[in-house]
A protein has these predicted regions:
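Solvent-exposed residues in well-ordered beta-strands and their adjoining turns
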Residues: 108-110, 166, 179-181, 206
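N-terminal lobe of the biotin/lipoate ligase/transferase fold
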Residues: 1-141, 145-157, 167, 211-212
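Conserved phosphate/anionic-ligand binding catalytic regions in large, soluble enzymes, centered on
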Residues: 171-184
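Histidine/acidic-rich helix-loop-helix segments that form or flank divalent-metal centers
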Residues: 160-163
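C-terminal accessory segment of soluble enzyme catalytic cores
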Residues: 148, 185-235
Length: 235
């Protein structure tokens, strides 16, 4: 059973978190490459990380994203104090704001599964199971990534968790953002994930709650991650 170290960076600027992710990601890849030149009994075990954090208001555009899905100007971004980054993950545009639970699994998939689609579907299952604990029925939308509420109803389908990753040499980075207590105001200024005519939602909105316990929900995510990835978490 692989071990995954849990890290919690709290509220952190996106650029700083991205750099810290890259450091862990590169460390794992470099170790894998070094192992190639060593006999099996001398190879080093590659690390795995599950990073939790939140970000100040930030828009990120993935490798398949279109700039026109950002509906405001650079000047408006500056006036609102919102950061914008073109990033090296898959997917289109999304929004990070305080009140989300952002999770970055930095994993060597050789410990888990060498199948990107299966990895993504398993990440979605972690969130689907977590939401079930809070009485929220969630699932997938055909031909779309992430976790959705009422995906079977075209007029009511709404995204509650966005996902986008990078993977090289079977090492992953980036991850997902689960909407919990956050405002949805900033989502009005983008075409979320590049999908038109679909809205976003939060756990609070679905449960008609003023606020929800972030740390408690993190524990649920950890539990389901450990079960679904057959991993031992270390904190």
């Amino acid at each position: 059973m692989p071990t995954v170290q849990v890290l919690d960076w709290g509220l952190i600027d996106y650029a700083q978190a991205w750099q810290q992710q890259e450091t862990l990601y590169r460390k794992t890849i470099d170790l894998k490459l070094a192992n190639r030149d060593l006999p099996p009994n001398e190879q080093h075990l590659t690390p795995n990380y599950l990073v939790f954090c939140e970000h100040p208001p930030t828009y990120t555009l993935g490798t398949s994203g279109k700039y026109e899905h950002l509906l405001i100007t650079p000047k408006q971004l500056e006036e609102q104090g919102v950061a914008f980054y073109k990033v090296n993950r898959g997917g289109d545009i999304t929004c990070h704001v305080p009140g989300q639970i952002v999770v970055y699994p930095i994993l060597d998939l050789h410990h888990f599964m060498t199948d990107i689609s299966r990895f993504m579907r398993t990440c979605e299952e972690v969130i689907i199971h977590t939401l079930q604990e809070y009485g929220i029925a969630a699932s997938r939308l055909a031909d779309a990534t992430g976790v959705w509420i009422e995906p079977q109803n075209p007029k009511q389908a709404r995204k509650i968790c966005a996902m986008g990753i990078r993977c090289s040499r079977w090492v992953t980075m980036h991850g997902w953002a689960l909407n919990v207590n956050n405002s949805l105001h900033f989502f009005d200024q983008i075409v979320p994930c590049g999908i038109k005519n679909k809205t976003v939602t939060t756990m609070c909105q679905e449960l008609k709650a003023d606020t929800l316990p972030i740390n408690e929900i993190k524990q649920s995510i950890k539990k389901h991650f450990a079960l679904l990835f057959n991993a031992q978490l270390s904190e």
